[in-house]
UniProtKB/Swiss-Prot annotation:
The keyword Glycoprotein does not apply. It holds the Pfam family tRNA_anti-codon. Belongs to the class-II aminoacyl-tRNA synthetase family. The lineage of its organism: Bacteria, Bacillati, Chloroflexota, Chloroflexia, Chloroflexales. Its EC number is 6.1.1.22. It comes from Chloroflexus aurantiacus (strain ATCC 29366 / DSM 635 / J-10-fl). CDD domains: AsnRS_cyto_like_N (cd04323), AsxRS_core (cd00776). InterPro entries: Aa-tRNA-synt_II (IPR004364), aa-tRNA-synth_II (IPR006195), aa-tRNA-synth_II/BPL/LPL (IPR045864), Asn-tRNA-ligase (IPR004522), Asp/Asn-tRNA-synth_IIb (IPR002312), NA-bd_OB-fold (IPR012340), NA-bd_OB_tRNA (IPR004365). It is found in: Cytoplasm. GO terms for biological process: asparaginyl-tRNA aminoacylation. GO terms for cellular component: cytoplasm. Homodimer. PANTHER family: ASPARAGINE--TRNA LIGASE, MITOCHONDRIAL-RELATED, ASPARTYL/LYSYL-TRNA SYNTHETASE. It comes from the Bacteria. This is Asparagine--tRNA ligase.
């Protein structure tokens, strides 16, 4: 006999009036004399299963009474439409098979502190809100990859262990690599994906990245996931157009397919509904002026001298002036990575942009036109105190058929936090890695 259910909660509407078997976990149970209401979740949704004592065997009713929170079971019964029921359907129970009992489940309806919940993250992901956030995360990832594939991009996987640093070694996790010296956990796949771009024209990589930043803010993780497209023969303007189309498509897909999850999270989607190209654009210079003009509106967003990078409060202040994501472009080259193309009309700034999400979620994308001149790139590598020999292969990309090209990296967790309205990024990844957390 197969253990597989004959239906799922997500497909239950097809089976009204029919007998089905569901398999899942007890999310909640209420007993009212001869009636027992079991809220069963199976990963695709939840449904109320009604056990009426006179309609089932004594054994089945006793099993229903014994069920505890998160017990796993198979329930067979008839599907009935009922607009009063959660989800609009109920299952009239005929039989229950207990598969795995659950004893004193630690996460109860009472309030638990964040530290307790994070220590039990392996169980917390079963809760309705965490489930909704992670379901939307999966949708964001699927939407991103499918959209890029439809646009002719090729997925190009890049290594996690690298011999060189893409943006300096300060924030890298290092490990010994046999007899070859140090290896680093990748902080980006960008340098390698540029090699793929020279082969395929339009590529992207997707995977985990690592930053050894001793940061405890609500926007930072030490391990997070990025998707990084790269396009040959594309300039800075092309790059921003690609980003706004990309982000708009992802948001539209989530609004279309994960509306129920957004409702579970009580997410106000008013601003999300307005996400469509073109996005507003301001320069770094204009952003500096905006910050000075609105001093005191956001705590910590103090005026900055030209040449300083923005902190989280500054990003929050800037984004608060727009109802959609906003590009801040042409940052000082000194605060950006060595590979960014200088503006030919103003070399002290780079042809780059950060895309800031509204509602205080900050930077979700960083991108730039890349330096394609080998002499200038070598000069920038030296200026950043990096060893030329570590980047010979990267310089080769400019020596053999160089072309102008651009790309960007989008942080999955920050996008998910913004779309779901989640205040802390730790809830947007199944098992967050933070400064003081590596368990479970």
């Amino acid at each position: 006999m197969s253990l597989l259910p004959t239906a799922t909660v997500a497909t239950i509407a097809r089976y009204v009036g029919q007998r089905v078997t569901l398999a899942g976990w007890v999310y909640h149970k209420t007993e009212k004399g001869k009636l027992i209401f079991i809220l069963l979740r199976d990963g695709s949704g939840t449904i109320q299963c009604v056990t009426f004592k006179k309609n089932v065997s004594e054994e089945t009713f006793a099993t229903a009474q014994s069920l505890t929170q998160e017990s796993s079971c198979r329930i067979t019964g008839s599907v009935r439409a009922d607009e009063r029921a959660p989800g609009g359907y109920e299952l009239d129970v005929e039989s229950i098979e207990l598969i795995g009992p659950s004893h004193e489940y630690p996460i109860t309806p009472k309030e638990h502190g964040v530290e307790f919940l994070m220590a039990h993250r392996h169980l917390w992901v079963r809760s309705a809100k965490q489930h909704a956030i992670l379901r939307i995360r999966a949708e964001v990832i699927a939407a991103a990859q499918e959209w890029l594939n439809e646009q002719g991009f090729v997925r190009f996987d890049t290594p996690i262990l690298t011999a060189t640093a893409a943006e300096g070694t300060t924030n890298l996790f290092a490990t010994d690599y046999f007899d070859l010296g140090k290896a680093y956990l990748a902080q980006t796949g960008q340098l390698y994906v540029e090699a793929g771009m020279m082969a395929f024209g339009k590529v992207y990589c997707f995977g985990p990245t690592f930053r050894a930043e001793k940061s405890k803010t609500r926007r930072h993780l030490t391990e997070f996931w990025m998707i990084e497209p790269e396009v040959a023969f594309a300039d800075h303007e092309d790059n921003m157009r690609l980003q706004e189309e990309f982000v708009s498509a992802i948001v539209a897909r989530v609004l279309e397919r994960r509306r129920d999850d957004l409702q579970t999270l009580e997410r106000d989607t008013t601003l999300l509904e307005q996400v469509r190209p073109p996005f507003p654009r301001i320069t770094y210079d204009e952003a500096i002026e905006l910050i000075a003009a609105h001093q005191g509106e956001v705590e910590g967003a103090d005026p900055l001298p030209w040449g300083e990078d923005f902190g989280a409060p500054h990003e929050t202040l800037i984004a608060s002036k727009f109802d959609r994501p906003v590009f801040v472009e042409r940052f000082p080259s000194a605060v950006k990575a060595f590979y960014m193309q200088p503006d030919p009309e103003r070399p002290e700034v780079a042809l780059c942009a950060d895309l800031l999400a509204p509602e205080g979620y900050g930077e979700i994308i960083g991108g730039s036109q890349r330096i394609h001149d080998p002499i200038l790139l070598e000069q920038r590598i030296r200026e950043h105190g990096l060893r030329i020999e570590d980047y010979e292969w990267y310089l080769d990309l400019r020596r053999y058929g160089t072309v102008p090209h651009s790309g960007f990296g989008m942080g999955i967790e920050r996008v998910v936090a913004w779309i779901t309205g989640t205040r802390h990024i730790r809830e947007t990844i199944p098992f967050p890695r933070q400064l003081y957390r590596i368990y479970p």
